[in-house]
């Protein structure tokens, strides 16, 4: 009796019989209807969301991170659109792929027999020239007879006919005879230098004799350039000495005439 009383007391204290484990295969129990007499709880105000930066757009929302659940449903379409962005842009642009999609076709040289078919020969058209107008005046007669034709370098065989003209000129690649230019040798003006030294001007005459001797020595050793330069200087000094002597002589004559015949 005590045990029964104790068991009943325990049931009354525990709030009924002990709880039996629920079967997961059993259907869910319907929710208890709300009592209309119980006062409704007021809804809590929603706090505004904190503005997020661009780096936080791809990160899961604060509510999902705090609850350990999946990202918010509003972030899922944005993430899906970001993943499909490059593919859709490349597909929409229609730009070809830069790399080779497959192996290039092997190179095959053209068949030499098919060359006449691909490139037909150029047709030979006869060239027709208009006759030249007749000259108004007859051509002048030749003053000198034409030079005789030089003999052929290689005589053709007997009875052979060539369809092309044969020229008996100098062979190509063989240099012709070198033309030698004969220039007159420069003059040393030695005699003129001595005369102007004696009768015109002693100083410039002596310098002219020096250049005349230098020109003669250059001619003796075959240096034509040095001989021409020395000869040109000797000639200039001879002319200067001659003009100076003529000027001095004329001035002396005028002075003598004026001194003798004028009071």
Curated annotation (Swiss-Prot):
It is found in: Membrane. Keywords: Membrane, Transmembrane, Transmembrane helix. It is a multi-pass membrane protein. Residues 37-47, 75-86 have a biased composition (Low complexity). The keyword Disulfide bond does not apply. InterPro entries: CD225/Dispanin (IPR051423), CD225/Dispanin_fam (IPR007593). Residues 1-107 are annotated as: Disordered. Belongs to the CD225/Dispanin family. PANTHER family: NG5, PROLINE RICH TRANSMEMBRANE PROTEIN 1B. This is Proline rich transmembrane protein 1B.
